Amino acid sequence: RFRKLFSVIEVFDSADFGLPQHRKRMIAGDFPVDLLNSYKTQIPKINFSEVLKSLSAKKTIRDPNYGFEIPADDVTELENEANLTDIETRINRDAKTFHTIYNNMSFPDKLDRPSRTITATCTRVSRESIIINSSNGFRRLNIREKGVLQGFPLTYQFYGNSYSSKNKMIGNAVPPILTYYIFQSMLETKTLELKHPRDSSYFHNIPNEKVKPSKLGMPNKKYPASRTFKFAVPHLRFGSGVRFELSNVAKTKWSFKFFYGSSKNIKSISLNNDLFKLIEPIILKNKTSNFEVTINDLIEEYKDYTSKGFQDVWVSQSENAVAFKFIDLVGSCVNEIVNSINWDKINDDLIPNIINEKNKKLTDNKESILTGFYLLSLLNTKVLSK
């Protein structure tokens, strides 16, 4: 609608302009865009690791973006929040590396490149959170690390009333380094005459007003009774939204589900007793070793964990990992069953007949898919439906 008002409407990645963060944003305006884009070849790139290394110095810290140095004691907001708990680590790892729908991400984040995009809001267990190794575990970034990744000088102060408000200030900002280069293009600075901020003798004085210390993020101690659980089962995650998952419908009814199809047309089938009765004779007829003992042991261990039981421990303050242990054991059991069946004798048309359509991805993974139908339908009936 307003396109005619601007000569330039283009998406830029700030990492191309030396910011140690991948940050793609649309910019509209009137400036020499070809000149701006030509700067990319002359701008030195900074990786995530360089930022972390600079900020870990004990005596003198050098600003990785602007090049000036100040005593480490003068740098504020370097306090780290508590490491992720084991449950928080598992949730983050699964959300990033085995998300039920979206593409996989690294966990922890890779340091040999610019960081992922800093966001204004993220919790300790969000897919968007940037997670790095810490002593004895994993942690989120502190305020200063985020500020430097966003291009703010070491001496810049964030006068927020809370930890979350400072995160919002940083995450909602336009990187100063990108605006510097846009301004240089508007000044028509030639590419070969361009100076990087580190070479421009820039120094941002420390303000006289002291920044208020923030209460750092901590693990949750209480969870609502309606806390949700939605995670794919190990060995039953096939990418592009195709997966078996354990989740709690209506916040209390726990069950295994199977999803397939495209991102625009997700489908599912019911993992119920009828499906189990259809699959069981085929599986048992073609088994090459006895795996029923493992299944019976699994059912026996979780016989007292009804849907309510799983929900009770999932919202408990102790952060009992029962649900994750359950899906891990289920995944191991799936792997054992897959290796105990003579699959050559099972018709490739079985899956298309069950879902009433042909699906190459499901057929290519028929061993795991059919095992999932068999085992998870049984567990829905014997454990979760009680």
Where are these regions (language model features)?
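Class I S-adenosyl-L-methionine
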Residues: 1-111
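C-terminal target-recognition/interaction regions appended to catalytic cores
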Residues: 80-386
